[in-house]
């Protein structure tokens, strides 16, 4: 992979997340070249102009271009996939699965054609099933396909916990496992505030279990809460920042540990599925799955999450 001074990143899907991510990557100058691709070509080109002009004010020379032709993603070092449709009223879970699976399959085939050496970060929902689709249809090695979910869930958990304790969010380190949704599993024994495990803070009386349970539940419903408040959209700044965090670790070979939807081949007792687990992301993509010992209770919740993901994958026709 090229260094950050020459790295090329393509964003497939030029909606709110794609636009916000383009601005973040351009402003931080983590990459040298950005490409936005979307079936809505005119909108994509308009967003390219808007972001490009914003970057000019920031003194960033990151080159940004875009359109509707997948050939533009050729020789990308990384591709972020946000394209897909949200679940609409009256649409069943299976309808959403199969509609977005078809979208992801088309994108996967184009990535295989134009950028088979790229790291692919999938954001499209339902997340864990769509990462599996990308892996299946692109033919890329498992370490080059990953889903963004746990980074976002961890950020939400950290935000809510920091607000509750009235401390800097930089003092909070959170770790979550499992799928992106109601069965997300925060690991309180491995989540810390100022280096002190959350479990220890509960035992010492600084936190109580009811407060933590409420924070966990709000984290699980974090995306839904934002949708209800916005009324006409969904979260995009935090998902974009989560992708930027992953990309920086990859492009700069930082080997940061973060929770992502990654391929499991026996780790945590799971095979042939993409599930949210802690991983090391470096220049080779997902370089290692980090295994934490789980209690019987934690394992039970994790197993439920795995079965939900397995059911989603099985439902794709």
Swiss-Prot record:
Substrate binds at residues 87, 93, 125, 156. GO terms for biological process: lactate metabolic process; tricarboxylic acid cycle. InterPro entries: L-lactate/malate_DH, Lactate/malate_DH_C, Lactate/malate_DH_N, Lactate_DH/Glyco_Ohase_4_C, Malate_DH_type3, NAD(P)-bd_dom_sf. It is an enzyme of class 1 (oxidoreductase). Keywords: NAD, Oxidoreductase, Tricarboxylic acid cycle. NAD(+) binds at residues 13-18, 38, 100, 123-125. One of its GO terms (molecular function) is L-lactate dehydrogenase activity. It catalyses: (S)-malate + NAD(+) = oxaloacetate + NADH + H(+). Its EC number is 1.1.1.37. The active site is at residue 180. Catalyzes the reversible oxidation of malate to oxaloacetate. Belongs to the LDH/MDH superfamily. MDH type 3 family. This is Malate dehydrogenase.
């Amino acid at each position: 992979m090229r260094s950050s001074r020459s790295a090329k990143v393509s964003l497939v899907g030029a909606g709110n997340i794609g636009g916000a991510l383009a601005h973040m990557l351009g402003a931080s100058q983590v990459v040298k070249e950005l490409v936005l691709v979307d079936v809505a070509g005119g909108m994509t080109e308009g967003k390219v102009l808007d972001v490009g002009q914003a970057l000019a004010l920031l003194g960033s020379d990151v080159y940004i271009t875009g359109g509707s032709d997948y050939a533009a993603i050729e020789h990308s070092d990384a591709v972020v996939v946000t394209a897909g449709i949200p679940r609409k009223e009256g649409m069943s879970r299976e309808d959403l699965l199969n509609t977005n699976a078809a979208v992801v399959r088309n994108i996967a085939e184009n990535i295989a054609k134009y950028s088979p050496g790229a790291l692919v970060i999938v954001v499209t929902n339902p997340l864990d099933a769509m990462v599996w689709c990308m892996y299946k249809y692109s033919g890329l090695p498992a370490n080059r396909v990953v889903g963004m979910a746990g980074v976002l869930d961890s950020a939400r958990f950290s935000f809510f916990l920091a607000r509750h304790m009235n401390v800097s969010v930089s003092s909070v380190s959170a770790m979550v496992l499992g799928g992106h949704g109601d069965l997300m599993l925060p690991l309180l024994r491995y989540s810390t505030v100022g280096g002190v495990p959350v479990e220890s803070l509960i035992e010492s009386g600084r936190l109580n279990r009811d407060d933590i349970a409420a924070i966990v539940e709000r984290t699980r419903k974090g995306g839904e809460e934002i949708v209800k408040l916005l009324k006409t959209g969904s979260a995009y700044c935090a998902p974009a920042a989560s992708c930027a965090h992953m990309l920086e670790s990859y492009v700069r070979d930082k080997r940061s540990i973060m929770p992502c939807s990654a391929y499991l081949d026996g780790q945590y007792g799971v095979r042939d599925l993409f599930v949210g687990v802690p991983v090391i992301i470096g220049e080779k993509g997902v370089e290692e799955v980090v295994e934490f010992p789980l209690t019987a209770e934690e394992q039970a919740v994790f197993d439920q999450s795995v079965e939900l993901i397995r059911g989603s994958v099985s439902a794709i026709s």
